[in-house]
């Protein structure tokens, strides 16, 4: 009986200090999400090799460190990612402990049936959604998906068809929460307005590309997420592995390795070198050599409910990523990082400014007519 009121032990790492996903999704998730794009060996030609044993070791390390949220997609590694994650959860008897997120939209059968024969295995339409979820449930060896994302907006299905079809899956219990990835803010806003106006399930989380070098999120995505109470799950936070310190790049060259990424050559671009040097400087101020930890800490400092996706194939990289959770950047450090590559917010923010409720500053136009305090 005394154990009933006994305080919980501290988590093994800060990864185990869970957070509520968003205002519209009360599920508790780890502050970093393990990305499943590298889990599998079908794409080894451009992502590096990872066999099943290595994948299970990485998944074990993530879970043992306190992580509970894993992100994948129907098409990753020609379906191996979902299959291996499903096998891992089943072999460890951990399905109920894991928050699994997957995606539909991508053509996940082209490799099997051939080009031109897989048209209805992709897209945002109801048929694509139906077969994708059917197959994802089988591959993941589960009865439900915690978070289902639209992988990207294909402009070929109406918002009404998409949101109605997704809501049916939620009603059936096959999906619990909805997310959207790589989609214009106006589409997400229209979709969430339609959903909430018609008693349907809205999107609770947005996933997209965001890092200190690519800050397009700040134009419309972050304000949209703030308005609808959505979480943000940025990918490419580490620049696709291209944010590397000078020391790390020299080590790679010594070992005969280049940068292995989706895009870009084996060498860093001039901008990547500059931002890597800036990240290295801030890392030294925090007593670490991990550039990636600073890159993760940066996006976490920019908005509420930010859950960065972390990838990679090595446990040592996972440990570096977890280190970010103990780092809090100062306003001066954030300002320094952002000064390396100036960001143009574009019109209309360049004219009217940002939301004064967030910035605590009046817009340039309003300040000419009124004096307003922001004490609340």
Curated annotation (Swiss-Prot):
Keywords: NADP, Oxidoreductase. Its EC number is 1.1.1.-. CDD domains: AKR_AKR9A3_9B1-4 (cd19147). NADP(+) binds at residues 236-246. GO terms for biological process: aldehyde metabolic process. One of its GO terms (molecular function) is aryl-alcohol dehydrogenase (NADP+) activity. The record marks 103 as: Lowers pKa of active site Tyr. The active site is at residue 76. Substrate binds at residue 151. It is an enzyme of class 1 (oxidoreductase). Belongs to the aldo/keto reductase family. Aldo/keto reductase 2 subfamily. This is Putative aryl-alcohol dehydrogenase AAD14.
């Amino acid at each position: 009986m005394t154990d009933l009121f006994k305080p919980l032990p501290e988590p093994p790492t800060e990864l185990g200090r869970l957070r509520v996903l968003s205002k519209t999704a009360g599920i508790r998730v780890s502050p970093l999400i393990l990305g499943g794009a590298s889990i599998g060996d079908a794409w080894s030609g451009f992502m590096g090799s990872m066999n099943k044993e290595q994948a299970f070791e990485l998944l074990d390390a993530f879970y043992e460190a306190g992580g509970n949220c894993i992100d994948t997609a129907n098409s990753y590694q020609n379906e191996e990612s979902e299959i291996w994650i499903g096998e891992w959860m089943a072999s460890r008897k951990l399905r109920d402990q894991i928050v699994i997120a997957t995606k539909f939209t991508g053509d996940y059968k082209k490799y099997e049936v051939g080009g031109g024969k897989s048209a209805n295995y992709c897209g945002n339409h109801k048929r694509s959604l139906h077969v994708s979820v059917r197959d994802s449930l089988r591959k993941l060896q589960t009865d439900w998906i915690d978070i289902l994302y639209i992988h990207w907006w294909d402009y070929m299905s109406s918002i009404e068809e998409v949101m109605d079809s997704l809501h049916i899956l939620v009603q059936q219990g096959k999906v619990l929460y909805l997310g959207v990835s790589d989609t214009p803010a106006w589409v997400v806003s229209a979709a969430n307005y339609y959903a909430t106006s018609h008693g349907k399930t809205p999107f609770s989380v947005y996933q997209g590309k965001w890092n200190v070098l690519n800050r397009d999120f700040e134009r419309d995505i972050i304000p949209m997420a703030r308005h609808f109470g959505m979480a943000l799950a940025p990918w490419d936070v580490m620049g696709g592995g291209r944010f590397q310190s000078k020391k790390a790049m020299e080590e790679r060259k010594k070992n005969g390795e280049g940068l292995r990424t989706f895009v870009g050559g084996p060498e860093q671009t001039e901008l990547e070198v500059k931002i890597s040097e800036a990240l290295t400087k801030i890392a030294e101020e925090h007593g670490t050599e991990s550039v990636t930890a600073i890159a993760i800490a940066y996006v976490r400092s920019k908005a509420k409910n930010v859950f960065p996706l972390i990838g990679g194939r090595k446990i040592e990289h996972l440990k570096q990523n977890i280190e970010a959770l103990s780092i809090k950047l100062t306003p001066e450090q954030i300002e320094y990082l952002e000064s390396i590559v100036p960001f143009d917010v574009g019109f209309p923010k360049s004219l009217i400014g940002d939301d004064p409720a967030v910035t605590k500053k009046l817009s340039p136009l309003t300040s000419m007519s009124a004096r307003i305090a922001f004490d609340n």
